[in-house]
Curated annotation (Swiss-Prot):
This is Neuronal calcium sensor 1. It comes from Rattus norvegicus. Monomer. Interacts with KCND2. Interacts in a calcium-independent manner with PI4KB, but only if myristoylated. This binding competes with CALN2/CABP7 binding to PI4KB. Interacts in a calcium-dependent manner with PICK1 (via AH domain). Interacts with ARF1, ARF3, ARF5 and ARF6. Interacts with IL1RAPL1. Interacts with RIC8A; interaction is favored in the absence of Ca(2+) and myristoylation of NCS1 is not required. A lipid is attached at residue 2 (N-myristoyl glycine). Changing residue 73 to A: Loss of magnesium-binding. Fourfold reduction in calcium affinity for NCS1/FREQ in the presence of magnesium. The gene is Ncs1. Keywords: Calcium, Cell membrane, Cytoplasm, Golgi apparatus, Lipoprotein, Membrane, Metal-binding, Myristate, Repeat, Synapse. Ca(2+) 2 binds at residues 109, 111, 113, 115, 120. Residues 36-47 are annotated as: Ancestral calcium site 1. One of its GO terms (biological process) is positive regulation of exocytosis. GO terms for molecular function: calcium ion binding; calcium sensitive guanylate cyclase activator activity; calcium-dependent protein kinase inhibitor activity; magnesium ion binding; protein kinase binding; voltage-gated calcium channel activity. Binds 3 calcium ions via the second, third and fourth EF-hand. EF-2 and EF-3 bind both magnesium and calcium, while EF-4 binds only calcium. At the resting state, magnesium is bound to EF-2 and EF-3 and upon activation, both sites bind calcium simultaneously while EF-4 is the last one to be occupied. Neuronal calcium sensor, regulator of G protein-coupled receptor phosphorylation in a calcium dependent manner. Directly regulates GRK1 (RHOK), but not GRK2 to GRK5. Can substitute for calmodulin. Stimulates PI4KB kinase activity. Involved in long-term synaptic plasticity through its interaction with PICK1. May also play a role in neuron differentiation through inhibition of the activity of N-type voltage-gated calcium channel.
Length: 190
């Protein structure tokens, strides 16, 4: 993909415009910024974590950033290329609610087996709590990752089998306004 070129080839721009919710001009602008920050044309896990640390200076986002990195890194080569970056950004910032929920499901399904187990969710929720640090005051019933996961599973795990399917996750998330709101945070920002 033209590693350190400051412009993408027209056919690449066209393809990314088809695969995302961005215009050709927006794709070019994002590429310019991506190459400025990642001259090699790729972003590794350490660089990704560094970006998260800028956004969450009062907590430790390392663990959460690693989980997000793994979802962005579609081809699992340990690096995020621009096409992976822009497609994930498109879903998280401008995707439909169902697209965002499928993306979030992939984030929580750490072993990619098609289910979110209690332990997988606990890993992610714990990482989120570490990331936000003491900057967020949580209600008593959610002031630990374990309590939050218990509440989520009580609401979403309809067949009580200890794991969530994509359908259970989507339906449960849509029924909880706070989850829908959290997924909409990026709307309109890009």
């Amino acid at each position: 993909m033209g590693k350190s070129n400051s412009k993408l080839k027209p056919e690449v721009v066209e393809e990314l415009t088809r695969k995302t919710y961005f215009t050709e001009k927006e794709v070019q602008q994002w590429y310019k910024g991506f190459i400025k920050d990642c001259p090699s044309g790729q972003l590794d896990a350490a660089g990704f974590q560094k970006i998260y640390k800028q956004f969450f200076p009062f907590g430790d986002p390392t663990k959460f950033a690693t989980f997000v990195f793994n979802v962005f890194d579609e081809n699992k080569d340990g690096r995020i290329e621009f096409s992976e970056f822009i497609q994930a950004l498109s879903v998280t910032s401008r995707g439909t609610l169902d697209e965002k929920l499928r993306w979030a499901f992939k984030l929580y399904d750490l072993d990619n087996d098609g289910y979110i187990t209690r332990n997988e969710m606990l890993d992610i929720v714990d990482a989120i709590y570490q990331m936000v640090g003491n900057t967020v005051e949580l209600p008593e019933e959610e002031n630990t990752p374990e309590k939050r996961v218990d509440r989520i599973f009580a609401m979403m795990d309809k067949n009580a089998d200890g794991k969530l399917t994509l359908q259970e996750f989507q339906e449960g998330s849509k029924a909880d306004p706070s989850i829908v709101q959290a997924l909409s945070l990026y709307d309109g920002l890009v």
